[in-house]
């Protein structure tokens, strides 16, 4: 696994929203989707908060586990990895800290058991 450069992770982690596109089996990218993301440790984490496991982008991840990210002025090739759910509470805390200015119901959509079950780690490729 390749790690993010510190400045890259900082820039992406500070971005209010990021865009990701999941790679299809034919090598093309699915449409970009806008999601919230939080840095934790040496990685960036995203969740499918609105549609959960039914979101098209989330369902596409297992096809190739690859894609592209646009965040903080950067565009990078990425890999999607299963998150260690032992850190869900820490990722929750990162979401609460970064997005605390949003109404409770909006922020809380990222903290539900279903959203937590969709936590994905994003690493550079």
Task: For the regions a language model picked out, list residue spans one by one.
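Short beta-strand segments
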Residues: 15-50, 79
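Short, structured beta-strand-loop surface elements
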Residues: 51-125
